[in-house]
Amino acid sequence: MKKMIFMAAALAMSMGAYAQGGNTRMGGSDGDIQSIAERVTNIEKKNDAFNVYFNYAASAQAEHNSLSGDWTTKIANKQFRLEIKGNLTDKLYYRLRHRMNKATDAKGEDNFAKATDIMMVGYNFNDKLSLSAGKMCQIWGGFEFDENPMYIYQYSDMVDNMDNFMAGVVLSYKPIASQEIAVEISNANNGKFVDEYGSGATVVSKEGKVEALEQAKNPLTYIVNWNGSFFNGLLNTRWAWGIQTQAKHKYSRMLTLGQQLNLPKFQWYFDYMGAFDDLDRLKIASSEFSAAGFADNAGDNAYLGKVHYNSFITKANWQFAPSWNLMVKGMYETASVSKIEKLKDYRKSYGYMGSLEYYP
């Protein structure tokens, strides 16, 4: 299916959106951007202990479905987030990010709502070593993954289907200022096993073979991450490898390789993301094909197994004039169920888009 999306109008309002930055850890430096508290009260900022940011984005969209030939239109709220963060001392810091347009019921595993992206505290032991704990964005590499959602018109299928705000602990070590190695242990899911997969869940890894899924005793995620910067920040990398415990003896392994060219008026990145799932974590393949159709007695809550996803993402920004930015983005993605002949390399999708942006 080919789907075209036209942004007839887009509105993005933020107080300190650039300072809010990305998803992982503190989301970037505040730089010289004022917090909303300063702007509203006109009080000079004396310290960095309390900063409040509101981020809002909405758009009017026209979509074309090439299969049916139908055009549809809508006006939609994309993002409405409140963020509070700060440095209580030169060593102790915190961050809260909460979405106003997501479910607020607490999940069974971590007791956080889906609406709460981040609620964490951290401690800098010194310039090289830090520890963060709480609910955070998992430290998968790649630049689309960590980009401020305010600036994403359409995510890749892979990132759009990832569930990555989890309770956990991150230990970060910087042997030199431009290089960081981080390790993370977090929950694999927000909810209990039965909440994620349903009662009596099964997996179909190959035709005719059904396995009952059992809850793992330690449903955790383990990630190793490298963030590198070279040539005074002109070339940056965000690479990661991790394994997630889906169920008993069922794991999801993921590799991410992100590279960025960062020039004064031109920025370009290229990401590769690959997922190798014993149990379909992204659930793209399982939503497009009924696993029960490939094995008898699979039950109502059946998922595909041995699923492999690839995602290639590239994006460029060019600030060709003051207050103006030209953005182009392309995506190519594949999906394959390796043990079911009919579903080997069954899915190839691509997307491309561009925008002309004005920042008053």
Q: Can you name each region flagged by the protein language model?
A:
Residues 40-64, 69-191, 228-233:
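Outer membrane beta-barrel
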Residues 34, 38, 78-82, 116-121, ...:
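Hydrophobic, lipid-facing positions within transmembrane beta-strands of outer-membrane proteins
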Residues 4-11, 18-59:
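N-terminal periplasmic/intermembrane-space "pro-region" immediately following the signal or transit peptide
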Residues 54-58, 96, 133, 171, ...:
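Membrane-embedded beta-strand positions of outer-membrane beta-barrel proteins
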Residues 64-71, 75, 104-115, 144-150, ...:
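Outer-membrane beta-barrel translocator domains and adjoining extracellular loop/strand segments
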Residues 190-192, 198-201, 209-220, 228-230:
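Solenoidal tandem-repeat scaffolds enriched in leucines and small polar residues
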Residues 47-49, 219, 224-339, 346, ...:
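Detector for outer-membrane/organellar transmembrane beta-barrel domains
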Residues 189-191, 250-251, 306, 358-359:
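Outer-membrane beta-barrel porins/channels
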